[in-house]
Amino acid sequence: MKDYEIVFTVFSSIIFAFLLFRLCKFCCVFCCALCNVPDNVYGRKRPRGSIVVEENEDDGNGEKEGLLNV
């Protein structure tokens, strides 16, 4: 192999590995969003100040109370 072929092979392998890593990370984040995995998995973070409403279990009178997380 000539020098330029070696350089091209190494350079293209690095680019391919980087693109494959980005694709895998995107797929993991997308699949976790579909499966409702918590927001802190794979570096996804809730924006500061966002409001999340969590429902408690039924308290016996047929109503559910919600907790507000800010």
Swiss-Prot record:
Source organism superkingdom: Eukaryota
Topology of the protein relative to the lipid bilayer: Single-pass membrane protein
Main location: membrane
Keywords associated with the record: Membrane, Transmembrane, Transmembrane helix
Name of the protein in question: Putative uncharacterized protein DDB_G0272506
Transmembrane domains' residue ranges: 15-37
One term under GO cellular component: membrane
Subcellular location: Membrane
